[in-house]
């Protein structure tokens, strides 16, 4: 498989985290409806929220349905430095309970050297135009995320908004229902974020605008069911799902989180395909979808620092049915760090995230090993720096990234002919988190 094809079939989720029944929305239907749907939703929200805010209920809702005091939503996961709106909109949806409405709207511009075939040297794009609807409390809970997006990732082609939304996870990328009989135990099902890895799927969920090299070896969003159980200081999750959005329910994954204190935590996560599946699409890379993988993520979070070292191992077993005639593995490590200036600083609102990564693959083409990076046996390192500013719901950030690959297979690396071994990008993203 050519490198461009493999990289098109990119996967952390984003979660760092991991069954709707049915297939993804088709690209053509999605392309024609994304922006119309967003406009209709915006108009509908305006019509609903105005009377909802003006009207006071004469009856006290049931205790489990009573809206909580305004606070930032914890879904989608946003580990920083960007933070969610602390005063989210909400309205009473009757039998559906109190519904919180938040979202992300952001364009970006990108410049790169050594672009892949079909890619552009410079471009502008909508990176997010999404609404989030959720009921996060009570016995019955739900979350629905709708809209358009892109998923920029290091060392891969950039796909515009229409193609990314249509060919990855559709205009409804995440949606699930959850039953939580106790605070410690819950069951959920739908389109879920992966449990594996340290980075999440969408730009606003991460320290950096672009996802990293390690993220590209992990699932991002899966259809499936998940059990969650908390027994302080431990939290467990177990999922049966379709892995890399394959619509083949042959994956099992799980995670265990140990919270030492409010500043330190450790997450061990693993998953894999217990069968061999031959599906290959943009969202479902053939070899990665037939892999097993393990990640170990430690996080230290104490202002002004957040530091996350991260280890990853993956293995694709030999299977002639998918073209892997010998097995191959990847070994990777990363450090994600962020420094945020305090409120008493003249640079209040500014943060400086940085990411270092190294990823190595095994095998060789002569023995029929699968290509997991830039040819069998190749390796790569990256650095990403993303100065960020946020004021209330507004944010702006600029990003420099550089990827350098070694032991590449000619034709499977960077540039129009796949012969270059480095790629540098500059990205700027701005928007609102309402």
Question: Can you say where each PLM-predicted feature lies in the sequence?
Answer:
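Extended rod-forming repeat segments used as scaffolds/tethers
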Residues: 9-15, 43, 63, 364, ...
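Short, conserved clusters of charged catalytic residues that mark active-site
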Residues: 84, 126, 172, 332, ...
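Acidic-residue sensor for enzyme active/binding pockets
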Residues: 56-59, 64-65, 145, 199, ...
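Outer membrane beta-barrel
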Residues: 88-253, 257-266, 342-344, 351-353, ...
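N-terminal periplasmic/intermembrane-space "pro-region" immediately following the signal or transit peptide
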Residues: 14, 23-113, 434
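Short, Lys/Arg-enriched N-terminal segments with co-localized hydrophobic residues
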Residues: 3-8, 12-26
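Outer-membrane beta-barrel pore domains
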Residues: 28-29, 73-78, 117-118, 161-167, ...
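Low-complexity, intrinsically disordered or signal/transmembrane-proximal segments
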Residues: 2-3, 60
């Amino acid at each position: 498989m050519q490198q461009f094809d493999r990289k098109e079939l990119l996967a952390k989720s984003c979660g760092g985290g991991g069954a709707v029944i049915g297939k993804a929305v088709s690209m053509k239907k999605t392309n024609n409806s994304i922006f119309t749907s967003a406009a209709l939703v915006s108009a509908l929200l305006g019509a609903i929220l105005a009377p909802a805010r003006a009207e006071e209920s004469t009856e006290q809702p049931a205790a489990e349905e009573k809206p909580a005091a305004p606070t930032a939503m914890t879904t989608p996961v946003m580990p920083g430095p960007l933070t969610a709106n602390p005063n989210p909109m909400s309205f009473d949806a009757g039998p559906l309970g109190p519904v919180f409405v938040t979202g992300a709207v952001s364009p970006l511009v990108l410049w790169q050297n050594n672009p892949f075939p079909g890619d552009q040297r410079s471009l502008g794009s909508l990176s997010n135009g999404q609404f989030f609807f959720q009921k996060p409390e009570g016995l019955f809970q739900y979350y629905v995320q709708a809209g358009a997006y892109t998923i920029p990732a290091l060392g891969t082609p950039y796909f515009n908004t229409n193609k990314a939304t249509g060919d990855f996870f559709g205009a409804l990328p995440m949606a699930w229902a959850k039953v939580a009989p106790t605070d410690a135990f819950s069951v959920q099902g739908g389109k879920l974020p992966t449990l594996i890895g340290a980075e999440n799927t969408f730009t606003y969920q991460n320290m950096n605008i672009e996802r990293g090299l390690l993220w590209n070896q992990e699932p991002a969003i899966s259809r499936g069911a998940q059990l969650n159980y908390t027994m302080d200081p431990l939290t467990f999750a177990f999922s049966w799902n379709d892995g890399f959005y394959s619509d083949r329910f042959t994956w099992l994954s799980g995670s265990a989180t140990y919270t030492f204190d409010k500043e330190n935590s450790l997450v061990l996560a693993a998953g894999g395909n217990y069968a061999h599946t031959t599906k290959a699409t943009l969202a479902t890379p053939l070899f990665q979808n037939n892999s097993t993988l393990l990640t170990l993520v430690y996080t230290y979070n104490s202002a002004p620092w957040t530091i996350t070292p991260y280890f990853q191992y993956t293995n694709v077993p030999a299977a002639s049915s998918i073209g892997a005639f010998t097995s191959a593995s990847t070994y990777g490590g990363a450090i994600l760090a962020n420094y945020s200036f305090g409120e008493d600083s003249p640079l209040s609102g500014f943060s400086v995230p940085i990411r270092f990564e190294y990823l190595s693959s095994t095998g060789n083409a002569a023995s029929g090993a699968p290509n997991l990076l830039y040819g069998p046996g190749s390796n790569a390192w990256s650095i990403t720096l993303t100065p960020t500013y946020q004021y209330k719901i507004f944010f702006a950030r600029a990003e420099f990234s550089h990827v350098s690959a070694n032991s590449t297979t000619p034709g499977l690396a960077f540039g129009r002919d796949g012969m270059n071994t480095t790629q540098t990008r500059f990205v700027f993203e701005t928007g609102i988190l309402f």
